[in-house]
Each structure stands twice: as C-alpha cells, then as structure tokens.
Amino acid sequence: MSSAPRRPASGADSFRTPEPEILGPATAGFPEQEEDELHRTLGVERFEEILQEAGSRGGEEPGRSYGEEDFEYHRQSSHHIHHPLSTHLPPDTRRRKTPQGPGRKSRRRPGASPTGETPTIEEGEEDEDEASEAEGARAPTQPSPASTPSSVQFFLQEDDGADRKAERTSPSPPPPLPHQEAAPRATKGAQTGALVEEVMAVAGGTAGGDDGGASGRPLTKAQPGHRSYNLQERRRIGSMTGAEQALLPRVPTDESEAQTLATADLDLMKSHRFEDVPGVRRHLVRKNAKGSVQSGREGREPGPTPRARPRAPHKPHEVFVELNELLLDKNQEPQWRETARWIKFEEDVEEETERWGKPHVASLSFRSLLELRRTLAHGAVLLDLDQQTLPGVAHQVVEQMVISDQIKAEDRADVLRALLLKHSHPSDEKDFSFPRNISAGSLGSLLGHHHGQGAESDPHVTEPLIGGVPETRLEVERERELSPPAPPAGITRSKSKHELKLLEKIPENAEATVVLVGCVEFLSRPTMAFVRLREAVELDAVLEVPVPVRFLFLLLGPSSANMDYHEIGRSISTLMSDKQFHEAAYLADEREDLLTAINAFLDCSVVLPPSEVQGEELLRSVAHFQRQMLKKREEQGRLLPTGAGLEPKSAQDKALLQMVEAAGAVEDDPLRRTGRPFGGLIRDVRRRYPHYLSDFRDALDPQCLAAVIFIYFAALSPAITFGGLLGEKTQDLIGVSELIMSTALQGVVFCLLGAQPLLVIGFSGPLLVFEEAFFSFCSSNDLEYLVGRVWIGFWLVLLALLMVALEGSFLVRFVSRFTQEIFAFLISLIFIYETFYKLVKIFQEHPLHGCSVSNSSEADSGDNATWAGTRVTLGLGNGSSAGPAGQGRPRGQPNTALLSLVLMAGTFFIAFFLRKFKNGRFFPGRVRRVIGDFGVPIAILIMVLVDYSIEDTYTQKLSVPSGFSVTAPEKRGWVINPLGEKSSFPVWMMVASLLPAILVFILIFMETQITTLIISKKERMLQKGSGFHLDLLLIVAMGGICALFGLPWLAAATVRSVTHANALTVMSKAVAPGDKPKIQEVKEQRVTGLLVALLVGLSIVIGDLLRQIPLAVLFGIFLYMGVTSLNGIQFYERLHLLLMPPKHHPDVTYVKKVRTLRMHLFTALQLLCLALLWAVMSTAASLAFPFILILTVPLRMVVLTRIFTEREMKCLDANEAEPVFDEREGVDEYNEMPMPV
C-alpha cells in the first residue's frame, strides 16, 4: 500500500510509556472511536492518514514499473554498509525495510505513546531532537500492485513470526480482529528502572479468511540483541540483489513520500540511514531498555539467527609498525618498499644511502590527521577478520571495498593485484642468504576459481543471492582446506644478522601492523581499509622480520586526489605505535571506537605554529608542555580500575580503590612500625631469610662473575686510598692493613647474615673525618686512641640494640635532601681541601730551587745520589709517616714537589676522563663501560708506571707491612686491652665514651639507612626485599667487636653499593631504538659480595705491589672522589645560579615553580649551615660535627616550614633522583645520590 507523507514525531512523543490498551481491528471505514483507541495505543500521530488512505485506495492504484535508471539509482544508493553507532545501541533503533514483493506485510513502529509522560533517557547528554527527527523521517514501504490493503505487523520476537507464518501465505486482505484480543507487552522492571517501550502488535490474515485470523495473545518482552536476520547478509552490493529476492532494499524512501520532500531532506534521510556520520552521536539507550522489533521474512523460518563465532578476547600486545609505499624499483616495476618503521619511535629509510636514520619522535601534520580521521569514518573497517594468508586478507578487503562503493567492480582485479605485489626492505640487498620474497601464492591460480554456493560461508564473505545471476569472483581457499606447500629440498630460510639484531629490539610477543599506502592511476578516488585479524598470523614475505601481523591499513588512490598518502601513512603508523591508541584498536568493537581513540590522541597532541624557529632552545617549552599533557593523561588513566574502561563513579568506589592502594603500599613498607619490641627485626628476618637458598642459586650466572671482578677493584681502590690517608691521620695506628682486614671480615659476615646483600660496606669520608677528630681529641688529652675506640664500640652495640628494639629506623625518613646535601657537600669540600693541603705540605718539605742554587744545605750530592739510588727502599720504610720531619724521611729533594703534582693531577684527570668516556660515543658501548668502570684502577696503574719510570726523583710511598701484620707493629698489636695498653684507661672516659659513640652512631645510621633506601627504590624492581633493622644491627655490632682488634668501623658505602646493584642488573634487550633501557631483573644473591670481601682480604699478599703506590696518586683519587661526589647535589647547582642571570637558568622544577629570590634564600640557608659545620670542624670541638649535622633535621622541619610554603618545599627539597642505567653523557651513579663518598 502507499502511504501519505508523515511528519517527524517529536522527542516527547517518541519516548512516552504506553498504557496497557486493547487493540482491535479496523474496518474499511474505521469508526471514530476505534481510531481514537488506535491513536492512544500506537501513539503514531499520522496513523489515521496512513490507514484511511490504505482503506480508500486499496489495490486500485496500478503498480509502478521501474526502468534501468531506477535500478542504477538503487545500486548506487543501497550498497553502503550500515555500521552501528555503538555496541550499546539496541537493535530496534536500526529500522529495516522489507521489499515490496507479493504477500509482503508492511510494518511500522509506534512513534509515540498515548500517555503524556515524558521519560528520561539514560544517556542524559544526548540531543533528543536529533533522534526524534530521525525516527519521524522513516517512511512506509511501497506495496505490490497486486496486493490488497494489509495490516501493519509488529513482531517482538522470533516466535511471533513463527506463529503468524500461516497468516502470510495469501495476498488477500485480512479480516477484522476482535477489539479485545490484543494484550499489553510487559512493562519496565522495577529493579533496573530502565525505560520499556510498550509495543502492541496488530495481526493480519489472508483475504480469503481461511483461518479467520489469529487470536491475539500477550506479547513477551523481546530479548535484547535478537534479530530475525543476520546483519552479515546485508554485506552485498546492489547488483547482486534481485528485485524479487531482495531481502533488504536500501532505497531511502518510497516514491510518494519522496515527491513531497525537498532534495535536502532526501539527502539528509539517505545520510542518516545509510552512512556513519562522524562526530554525530545518536541516543545511546541500554539494550534492556527497549524490546526489539523483529520481522519474519517470506521463504525463511524465523527461528534463531545463526550467529558468527564469538570474538576471542583481545589482549593488547606491544606493536611493531612497518610503513610500505607503492614505488617503482630499478626495473620500473611497482613494488611495496619499506620506507619507515616504528618500534616506539620513528625510523626512516634515507633515500640516498638506503640505511636507517636515527630514531626520533614523529612529527605529523595536522591536516594528515584530519584526513586520516575522515578516511576512517567513510572507509572500510573489518574487525576480527578470520583469514590466515595475505591473499585471503586481500580478497576480503577488495570485496569490502566493492560493497562499500569505494571502488568499481571492474577495478577489483587491479586492486587485488596491487595488494599482492612484492615487498622489499632496505636490508634485502645486505643479506646473502636465501631471499625473503617467497611467493605466497600464484595470482593466476586465483582468477579461474569459482565460489561454491554450497560451501560453508564465512561471516565476512559475501555469498550470492539465491536465484541470482552467478558472477565470476576471485576467491582464495582457506588455509585450513589446503596443506601448506612443502619448501624445495635443500633450501632453508635462515635469519640474517640484521633480522636477529632487530628482533632483539622488538618486545617479546609483539604483534605487527602493516601500513600500505600508494598512488594508483586506475582508481578515480582514494580507497581505504582498516583490518584487524581475529588472530595474529605471520604473513610470508611481507615484514622485514618474522613477526605475526594483527593489523593492516591500506590506502590507495590517484595522484590527482588532494591527499598526501605518505603523511597519512605516517599518521596511522604513529597512532598504532601510541600505547593508548593501539590498546583502543585491540578492544574496538566498531568504527566509532577508532574515531574516539583518534580524538583522544588529538587531545594530547601539540600543534606548532607555522613560524620559523631560529634555535632549538625555542622548542624547550614544547617538550615541557608535552610532558605536562602526558602526565595529565597518565593521571586520568590511573583513576580507571584495571581491566575496566570506566572511572570509579561513586565515592565508595574511589575510597575502596584508595584503600587498596594504601594497603599495598603499607604491606611492602619495611620501615612500618609494628609497636612490638624488635618487631621490625623479626619482620626483616621473616621477609628475607626464606630466600636464603635462592641467594646462592641465583649466583650461577656469568654476569655475577663479571660483577665480582669489577666490584673487587671498586672496593679495593677506596680501601687503599682511605687506608693510606687514615695512616697519615693516626700516625699509622690504623692504616692499610687494618682497613683491608676490616673490610674483608665484616664483608664476609654481612654477606652471610645481612638482609640486603647488595650493600657493599666499607670506609667512607665521614668516618675518616671522625677518626681524625677523635685522634686529635685523644692526643690533646693524653688518652690512648685505640682503647677509647674499644669503649666507643661497646656503647655502639648498646645503642644499636636500643634503636632496633624501638624500631627507630623509621627516623631515616626525616633526613631529607636538605640535610643530605649539606652532609655530602661538606665531605666533598673536606676531600678537596685535604688534597691541596697535602700537596702544599709537600711543596713546603721539598721546595723548588733555581738551577744556580746548590742543594748542599740540605744534603750533599752523594747523599742525593744515595736517596735517588735507594728511593724504593726509603719509600718502603718511610712512605706513610705523618710525624714531624726527621724520622729518616728526606727533605728538600729536587723535583719531588713537581712530580707529586704531576702524579696527583694525572691520576685525577685520567680517572675523571675515563668516567666521561664511559658515556661517550667512541667504541662500542660494552668496551666503553668496561673502560669507564675500571677508570680508577687504570689511573692508579698508569701513574704508578710513570713514577716507576722516573728513577732519579724521590716520592713518598704507601706504607704497607710485609705479610699478615699491623701497619706499625712497634706501636700496637692485633688485640687491644680495654683497660689500657701503656697505662690505666680512666673510668670517667669509659662512661664519657657514650658521647662520641652517639656521634659515630649518627654517621653510621645515616649512611647505612640512606644507602639502603637508595638501593630499595621501587624503580630497581628488587623482589626479595630489604631489612633496615637487621642490616643496621649487624653493621654496628660488627664495628663494636672490631674495635677490640683495633680495626676501623665501617658503614654501607653509597657509591660502591649502587655500583654493585647496577652491575647485577639485567637490562632488557628488547629496547626500542631511542628508548631508555628497562630493568628485566636484578641478580639478588650473596655470592658476589662474599667473593669480593675474600678477594679484598687476600690483597694483603700483594703488599709488594701496594708499596709502589705513591701517596700523591692517592691524593689524586681523593680529589677525584671529592669532585665527582658534587654531581647530583642540587645545592651545588643552585650555587651556580647565584652567579647566573635568570634567563640562563635551567628548565628544572625548583627554578620554574619557585621565585628566584625565594630559591636563593633557601640556598643561602643551606650555605649558612655548611659554614657553621666547617667552623665547628676547624676548632677543637670538631668531634661534635655529627651532632651539629643532625640538628639540621629539626631545622628543616620546624624553621623552614614557617619560611617557605609547602609547595616551595616540595620543589626545593624533593628527592627526584632516579636510578641511572642509560648512557647519558656526564651522568652516572654519582648523580643518583646526594650522599658523601
């Protein structure tokens, strides 16, 4: 039947909840009362016009004949694929029209409800007018000319159509139905509160009244998502659809309604019904909000719709993106040539040299991104394509392009041929193995292949219509139906070195994205396809390396199109390399998800104005702005629960998420107090000792052996250096022998029992300063230095027990960067000062003389010859004497001062240069690291050889005894009498030793706990945990016991511990070019530290070699440690800013977030505290410098918080140091910690 035009229903009418009404039949005249009831029941405002015209005209209007022009219009307007706007959109929102064949029943959905209630839509942000206009614009279908007026049918479920199948067998008009036979549909549920639209069905019978009509029955609620047909059946072009068998015609409306509408209305209707308009959202209503309006179809049992195989859940993987462009080779043959690739950053192929350029951040044009979004909005999108070969994928893509009217049917073979062209890569000419481009299949074998109509159809394969004209098509057999061809005998495919090297950089389980772009002149307009395979498969001869492919992007078009194909290819490649976008591509269910992901990418992109940039400094703000946007993006991502795409909405969900995060943080906190005596110590034992056996099994690795050799020299060099200087300070009461033995013994015990065996314990600068101060105090008060150390050790053990019992290790959290930097800067100044002080002293003992001045005043020429000839012997006996001159050590030797200066400066500059060389660009990285790590031993060796080669100049040597002996056997033995060696030790000093014990405990506590904090940072990814309480107790207790033997105290050495941890860190080989290396694992074991301690102890047997080391060389190492420990100290950097104009200040947080004067005020306060400490150390009260140092903690907590705001303190006193694993120039372990060496 033909219907009169109807006007769009309003938004209020479209979403009214109907009342339960009884629907009866309508006679030819339709009385007024029944018309009112029908109005109230169906709520369609112009239902009166439809039915009256149907009753009046009936079958009198002759059928319209269609010509070739009409069929051409039908083909051009009906082959657009209809994609749902959202997965949440219920099926009943997509209107479907049945063709006007004989016996067809027209159907209509009610547009409004009889009640005046206006319900709310769950998606409250949508525009109701747009949806209502779209609903009202849908027109009735045109009847067959031979048919009589038929009723409107509404089916809510498949069984409705089954029950009424008999009623559709005759073209006769239906008889009237009783008014009381229809029943209401189920209303909305109280639990969900969702809107349920009540739809009443009017059943029609045959004209002859064979069965007299079917009685009405209560309608059940439609199951969401059920359809009476498969959406995949709509994927066919119009030319394949016969008029009499057409199931789903795509004409926008019928002729009668089209005559009353303007051209703009028709275009809008066609666009709304058959296109997926980008940027326009329809009303999103949950599936359970409405029932589905289904339709039975003639000639088919309306049973359950056969469903495609369920989509496997897609877990996002790392991606490898390859951009291939359609270019001509040397023989002027077209081929796909790789021009760029993305692992994380873009790498381009240099055209002239055919080699890969440096990785860089991809810079995209804004227009290319807009063009990409437009092509994705209108191109072909195939998600979860079930194909295993490139020809199979290409065939599906080409068919989809034909269906979506992107290409003509006659261009099918040309596009398919272009997709199957050869792929070439820059590394092909470098490889001499079997060529990679093995034919994946003969294109000629595909041309004569017919599609079997009886074969099982794939959901993505178009099948010919029943009764339609058969058409010759290109078809590829499924891979499961054909056995793979056997390779030729004797030929194997081996990976080249280039492939192996590239595969190391690609993350494990990565999946590839192939981007194909190019110009072809046989197309009249660009065509695009985005494909996601159901399962990742390796496509032969496509990629540079054998990585399974999951995504393909194709863009072909003529050169006349106003489109830059290369830039669009770079844009989609960059998008796929972006983490958020490729995760969205994995989880996308439809085209809208991809478009939304592109919009999210644009939200975090930066657009540069088209202005000329004179220097790179002008672009610094761009990087900072980008970091801010990425930080905001990450913060928004953290708010989302893992595995969900929604933000926690309620306050309870957010509170629960915060509680879970806080619980995880508290559970892993080793400094958390238990409230029980020794509770922290017990937790340390329970946490660490269960891994005791694995601490030895994990050492069975070649990397551990290399770490032993490296750490041995890293531990021996400071032991020799500090031992020699300690002998100078204590008149050989404690020297190299004692320090080596203490390092070995305490190192062995700590590695066997400690909670964090990655710590390297050793002597340090702060302990050297304390030993010098305590020795001066004992000398001035006629006290025995070694006996006093015994009583200090006794009190140290008691203090450690008290601290561990009270779980006092948490106090290390209050030692902020403010105190650490003052401490580290003070020790560095002491190192540098002592170096030049010793050098000046050498110049005083051996002054420079003119050439004409005789040296007889000091010694005659014979004596000089004797000193020169016996320099080694004198050096062995007097090399480390620190007492007044006259103990057999020569004075006034010519050139001694100059040679000492050369040795000191040479040692410093060689060690410093090798440290810089480690992060330089010469030689491979492995060679540079070896040279840089052994920089200090290499510097010592070179300078010792230089000194040994100069035989006629005297230099003071290191004092090392022969064999297992103390440094000065005539002064002391291996066991110290606590009551006094030469005289009785005063009792008051036994008690007063508590004060220096507190001071040295402060030093050991700060160094050990802060070092443990640095080692235990979460960035290092340690798995076995640490033990603050257990390690502190062991180190202090061992120091107290070693004092009985006259051995020095030790603490956790920060630089050596960090070096040890870095040496045992295994970095991932799958590092994208240009990216920072990531930690794969850390070899947490006890064997390396144990072997290093044993080797240091055995070094006592190489005393003959150690006695050849001049003290000037040790002064150079001392200077090196003082200078390098200044790196990474923010206080030192802010001192530079005092002399620098603000425009040259660096782009760091404490400069940008804090005003310059306030920043300088903070620096001045630190400088004042440093000056106070230096003044204390220059007086007789130098022993109390640890107490003055610890006072800076309450100063920072009480005074500075009143001067500076909380935000300023976070910027100026924040610990931003991170573990350093990459090879940035001038950055190493010293930059990681503001702690003294």
UniProtKB/Swiss-Prot annotation:
NCBIfam families: ae. Residues 1-237, 286-316, 445-466 are annotated as: Disordered. Its main location: membrane. It holds the Pfam family Band_3_cyto. The modification N6-methyllysine is found at residue 270. A lipid is attached at residue 1169 (S-palmitoyl cysteine). Residues 120-133 have a biased composition (Acidic residues). Keywords: Anion exchange, Antiport, Cell membrane, Glycoprotein, Ion transport, Lipoprotein, Membrane, Methylation, Palmitate, Phosphoprotein, Transmembrane, Transmembrane helix, Transport. This is Anion exchange protein 2. The modification Phosphothreonine is found at residue 253. The modification Phosphoserine is found at residues 113, 132, 144, 170, 172, 239, 439. It catalyses: hydrogencarbonate(in) + chloride(out) = hydrogencarbonate(out) + chloride(in). Residues 76-85, 94-110 have a biased composition (Basic residues). One of its GO terms (biological process) is transmembrane transport. Sodium-independent anion exchanger which mediates the electroneutral exchange of chloride for bicarbonate ions across the cell membrane. Plays an important role in osteoclast differentiation and function. Regulates bone resorption and calpain-dependent actin cytoskeleton organization in osteoclasts via anion exchange-dependent control of pH. Essential for intracellular pH regulation in CD8(+) T-cells upon CD3 stimulation, modulating CD8(+) T-cell response. Belongs to the anion exchanger (TC 2.A.31) family. GO terms for cellular component: apical plasma membrane; basolateral plasma membrane; plasma membrane.
